[in-house]
Amino acid sequence: MHQGVITFSRNVFLPLTTVCQNHCGYCSFWTPIQKGCIMGREQVIETLRLGAGAGCTEALFTFGERPEMVPGFSEHLAAIGYSSILDYCYDLCKEALRFGILPHTNAGVLSTGEMERLREVNASMGLMLETTADVPAHQGSIGKSPAERLSMIARAGKLRIPFTTGILLGIGETTRDREESLEAIADLQREYGHIQEVIVQNFCPKEGTPMADVTPITTETFCETVRMARAILPEEVAVQVAPNLADAGVLVGCGANDLGGISPVTIDYVNPEHPWPAIDRLTEVAGDAVLRERLCIYPQYITQGWYPPSMEPLIRSLSIKIQERSL
């Protein structure tokens, strides 16, 4: 990423289900199985249509990890004609491409075979590391094993999948834990070269969760961690912060250079109490830096051809579109 440039992606957020095998102490995204626990195809299509009309270039597909492991969920899947949430996601990624929007899927820990299949219809993928530490917030969350998550990130590297990961601050980890987490990500990047951005995200307490009364990190600690990330991560890896969760203008001054996906159409379903800033206000966050729109696949991976050949016309077309919007 060029110095003095702050980037963002224009996206739509599509939470296909909030059912999850994990029960993290800080999460309000999780819900029990109930009617409507799967986002219907019609709603997805309508959201994609609105996103395309608003100039969105990224469809963020996310959902609870391994929801089929939760008793009763498979019946809801069967009712819409599927036996696997990943099969459903695959088909909806194809719909996104049909609307001219590039899919980016974050589905939790996946096997090599599952990633190989999803990469056919995704321009990039992601998985938050969160932390390498064993923290109480992850008790009862089988999918939050740091070793399992690091292993998946490595497998994505072997498959040459442009990848997003990140750390979560304020869930019981120490400063040294943050450093170790960033060092682990940096090591994977040096080995495989596939990590395009690392999210440094602050935990925001949610009412009704076990960690509702936990004090969030201070702006000073957040800024120190962003500086740490910039110092530890290879230069080509963007440091991303969410402008709806913190004072991103301050964090840009500490070394952050990406604002992540911002949607003119959908809310942040993980943090619904924190609305996105309007895209035309992002220049205020960027300050003296140049604000530049990007795709969910970063330019260096486009140059290297790290995408399915079938996506090339769309990637080229969208690259031109965002360049024209920046003029």
Curated annotation (Swiss-Prot):
Pathway: Cofactor biosynthesis; coenzyme F0 biosynthesis. Residues 6-244 form the Radical SAM core domain. Binds 1 [4Fe-4S] cluster. The cluster is coordinated with 3 cysteines and an exchangeable S-adenosyl-L-methionine. Its cofactor is [4Fe-4S] cluster. Its EC number is 4.3.1.32. Pfam families: Radical_SAM. PROSITE patterns: RADICAL_SAM. SUPFAM superfamilies: Radical SAM enzymes. GO terms for molecular function: 4 iron, 4 sulfur cluster binding; 7,8-didemethyl-8-hydroxy-5-deazariboflavin synthase activity; iron ion binding; transferase activity, transferring alkyl or aryl (other than methyl) groups. It comes from the Archaea. Belongs to the radical SAM superfamily. CofG family. Catalyzes the radical-mediated synthesis of 7,8-didemethyl-8-hydroxy-5-deazariboflavin from 5-amino-5-(4-hydroxybenzyl)-6-(D-ribitylimino)-5,6-dihydrouracil. Consists of two subunits, CofG and CofH. This is 7,8-didemethyl-8-hydroxy-5-deazariboflavin synthase. It comes from Methanosphaerula palustris (strain ATCC BAA-1556 / DSM 19958 / E1-9c). The gene is cofG.
